[in-house]
A protein has these predicted regions:
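Catalytic-core regions of glycoside hydrolase
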Residues: 1-67, 71-77
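C-terminal non-catalytic alpha-helical accessory regions
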Residues: 76-189
Length: 189
């Protein structure tokens, strides 16, 4: 049973699909290596943002050897090219790899650093702890917050450029599978 989305404590993540393909590969390969080979179940809340992660999961469930640790990026690139055309797909690959890297640092849904029902936090009347600012530093580590935000701006620019290469019949899919996620994550960063 694998979560591409999660609803529960201390934080859910159901709005975007931010699970890195490398994590999916590693955990599902581990499950397979420990003899979980008959039934794989995936929890996914919104299919459109999770389209690639879901396909990766299903490809591995069908044939564990269809993807390896060294061909994972090729798998993503092939999916991007199939869905949005070769030019757009190749342009999107570095942006999507960076998107997953940034989401691995901190899930966009978790940027407020809010926790629920924890005794070590000041609790608001609604039962949730107080929202506090991110602990990304403006000054330490060479301005990590600025680097984080600049990284999102760069991938937004790449996504916007790639969108121009997408045929009109694929624009809706592009929005729901790529642009919505990147721009949504950036807005919360």
């Amino acid at each position: 049973y694998y979560h591409l989305s999660y609803w529960g404590r201390p934080h859910d993540y159901m709005w975007l699909c931010t699970t890195q393909p490398g994590l999916i590969y590693n955990e599902m390969k581990q499950a397979y290596d420990h003899n979980a080979r008959e039934v794989w179940i995936v929890n996914v809340h919104d299919l459109k943002p999770a389209a690639y992660d879901l396909e990766l999961f299903l490809d591995m469930a069908w044939d564990i050897n269809s993807v390896t640790g060294t061909t994972l990026n090729n798998h993503l690139e092939a999916w991007l090219c199939r869905e949005f055309g070769s030019q757009a797909g190749k342009k999107l690959l570095p942006a999507m790899l960076e998107y997953y890297r940034l989401c691995g640092i901190r899930k966009p849904e978790h940027m407020g650093w809010t926790q629920v029902e924890l005794s070590n936090r000041k609790v608001h009347p609604r039962g949730r702890s107080q929202v506090i600012n991110t602990e990304f530093s403006l000054t330490e580590f060479g301005g990590e917050l600025d680097r984080y935000l600049e990284s999102y701006e760069k991938i937004k620019t790449t996504v916007t450029e790639a969108e121009k290469l997408v045929t009109p019949d694929r624009k809706d899919a592009f929005y729901s599978h790529i642009k919505y996620q990147v721009f949504g994550a950036s807005a919360m960063a």
